[in-house]
Amino acid sequence: MSVRSLYGISGLRISTRTFSKTAFRLQEQVNQTQESTDTEINGRPLVPANLKNAKGERLMIPSKLQENALRNYELERLRIIPKLNTFYGGNPVHEENLNTLNGLIRKYINLPTRIVDDKEIQNTKFVSFEEYKTRIQSGTRLKPIHHKELTQLLHRLRSIDPELMPREVSDVLAKFANTSSESAKAAQKVKTLDEFGRAISLGKRKRSVAKVYLTKGDGQVMVNGKSLLEYFPKEADRRRIAYPFQVVSQEGQYNVFAEVQSGGSTGQAEAVMYGIAKDLVIFNPLLKSRLHKSGLMTRDARKVERKKPGKVKARKSPTWVKR
């Protein structure tokens, strides 16, 4: 029954003023209940309704939240923490890879490096742009410049001397290796001393081939079962054999046993020289840079040029006669 219908009943008097005040009181109770509920949920005191429109009134609000809200250990345990430190970056997985490679470079910055030859670069290639894009699943965010940055850091790590390369660097290089060419590439073997403490290597020059055994000793040199003076009577040949020891300042500290075949005395002497240089690197890899600067790690590939038909020798032409 509505209020208007009640007015039509005779003898019934209704105070509209009392009814309106009761409604306002109910509304205030509902507002206070909602404010107390919000305060319990948020943990922050709200401004009372009677002070919202008041001017000049000072409201005291505590400066700290409730302690139980700050010490919610269950929330700390269940909250989601990103796995990567670069989660909020533009390209998280790629940036994490760069951070890892830069960290390894800074860690092993003092290790000696080498010049990677073209043959090794062709045999051991790193992951391509398309394969890297599929692996990290970055979509269009990965650009070719990002792949170039990655390969530059990988080439810097690969330039570390193989004899001194740490295990974690080798694992990272294997992680970014090109899987399509892994079956075709030949693993580079690091030479070490044999069970008798000897370093064995092969030296070549012209047509001569020398197999050189190097051990710690007092400076004796044997070539094909003969002494150095007996096998190489020329002083220039003996100087070539002693040259690697002079470069590293270790004369008289090793014994040399060489087996040489083919070629002349000069070719055989230089073949033994290159073999001794390789053996010294096996004993101490740190000597490689010094021997490389002296030209002992790259053999002289020149050979005698064959005689051509119509020529007196390889290039000399016969004397021209007018008549």
Curated annotation (Swiss-Prot):
Keywords: Mitochondrion, Ribonucleoprotein, Ribosomal protein, Transit peptide. The keyword Thylakoid does not apply. InterPro entries: Ribosomal_Su5_D2-typ_SF, Ribosomal_uS9, Ribosomal_uS9_bac/plastid, Ribosomal_uS9_CS, Ribsml_uS5_D2-typ_fold_subgr. PROSITE patterns: RIBOSOMAL_S9 (PS00360). Residues 304-323 have a biased composition (Basic residues). Pfam families: Ribosomal_S9 (PF00380). One of its GO terms (cellular component) is mitochondrial small ribosomal subunit. It is found in: Mitochondrion. Residues 298-323 are annotated as: Disordered. One of its GO terms (biological process) is translation. Signal peptide: none annotated. The keyword Transit peptide applies. GO terms for molecular function: RNA binding; structural constituent of ribosome. Belongs to the universal ribosomal protein uS9 family. NCBIfam families: PRK00132.1. This is Small ribosomal subunit protein uS9m. It comes from Debaryomyces hansenii (strain ATCC 36239 / CBS 767 / BCRC 21394 / JCM 1990 / NBRC 0083 / IGC 2968).
